[in-house]
Amino acid sequence: ARPMLTAALYIPRILQYTGCKRREEVVAMSDKKIIIDVVVDVQKDFITGALANEQAQANVAHLAKVAKAHAEAGHWMFFTRDTHEDNYLDTREGRHLPVEHCIEGTDGWNFAPELEDAMDDTEPEVSHIVCKKTFGAYMLPSDILDELMAHNKAVDDIEKIIVYGYCTDICVISNAMVLRAAFPEVEIEIRSDCCAGVTPQSHQTALDALRACQFTIV
């Protein structure tokens, strides 16, 4: 099992690779806190395609502006991407939701043009696409840990994680719970103005559930 990545675990490696001589130098190097954005499934099929959503259509431009501003402010950006294969209807999810969507390589699988255009104008320090075959990206915490290690950082260096995207009541809440299980002491914020549920009612129900599970709703 992967050990919990703490500042204490990292210090010997940082000393080795940076040439720092004293523990105090390492602590000073890692003072800057990291804010991570997890942008969930902002793909055409969830906005104007197979699972078109009027609420997503109404706020995708705002979401893209927020993502761009956060990237320019130095946030680490992780984008989940729902990714299915041609046999989607034969899967468990497909049997319960028999609407083909986000089939890899199709137009609906692509990110929304508003998000693509916004991110084309920025160069985040970290920009990572996480493809996933189901609601929650189980590999997302591992990808975050890998980036922390690559930057000689620790979980303790995360100020907060901000989660937003589509749909609030399915993939947003699923990925928020994955992150909460992996990072129990990290503040996780849900940007409700950058989310949309299958319906306005299910959006609110998901936010209520997230609030009950100690996520910060803004």
Question: For the regions a protein language model found, what residue spans apply to each?
Answer:
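Short, Lys/Arg-enriched N-terminal segments with co-localized hydrophobic residues
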Residues: 1-3, 8-28
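Generic short N-terminal amphipathic or hydrophobic helices
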Residues: 10-13, 157, 187
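Conserved N-terminal glycine/acidic-rich loop preference
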Residues: 132-174, 196-218
